């Protein structure tokens, strides 16, 4: 996973 994706994924998933 990448920096931009981590923030977007964690923010949207959690």
From Swiss-Prot:
It catalyses: (R)-prunasin + H2O = mandelonitrile + D-glucose. It comes from the Eukaryota. It is an enzyme of class 3 (hydrolase). One of its GO terms (molecular function) is prunasin beta-glucosidase activity. Its EC number is 3.2.1.118. Keywords: Glycoprotein, Glycosidase, Hydrolase. Glycosylated. Monomer. This is Prunasin beta-glucosidase 1. It comes from Prunus serotina (Black cherry).
């Amino acid at each position: 996973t990448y920096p931009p994706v981590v923030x977007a994924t964690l923010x949207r998933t959690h």
